[in-house]
Amino acid sequence: MENNNRFMPHIRRTTHIMMFAHRNSFDFHFFNAR
């Protein structure tokens, strides 16, 4: 249980980073397109 609880935050942080990176890439692509 402890391991699972400690592993959950990591997954959430990774998802957040991936989301942020994806959004940054999208904005950059839009900026480049313009």
Swiss-Prot record:
Alphabetic keyword roster: Leader peptide, RNA-binding, rRNA-binding, Transcription, Transcription regulation, Translation regulation
Motif (Ornithine recognition loop): 10-16
Binding residue positions for L-ornithine: R13
The keyword 4Fe-4S is assigned to this record: no
Conditions for induction: Induced by ornithine, repressed by putrescine. Part of the speFL-speF-potE operon.
The keyword Transcription regulation is assigned to this record: yes
One of the GO BP terms on file: regulation of translational elongation
InterPro entries found in the cross-reference section: SpeFL (IPR021237)
Entry's Gene Ontology molecular function annotations: rRNA binding
Pfam families membership: SpeFL
Knockout mutant characteristics: Replacing its start codon by AAA (Lys) prevents expression of SpeFL and leads to generation of a prematurely truncated speF transcript, and thus prevents expression of downstream SpeF.
General function of this protein: A small protein (arrest peptide) encoded upstream of inducible ornithine carboxylase gene (speF) that controls expression of downstream genes (speF and potE) by transcriptional and translational attenuation. Its expression controls transcription and translation of downstream SpeF; translation pausing at low Arg levels on this mRNA prevents premature Rho-dependent transcription termination of speF and also enhances SprF translation by preventing sequestration of its ribosome-binding site.
Family: Belongs to the speF operon leader peptide family.
Assembly and interaction partners: Binds ornithine in stalled 70S ribosomes, blocking the upper two-thirds of the exit tunnel. Contacts 23S rRNA and ribosomal proteins L4 and L22.
Protein name: Leader peptide SpeFL
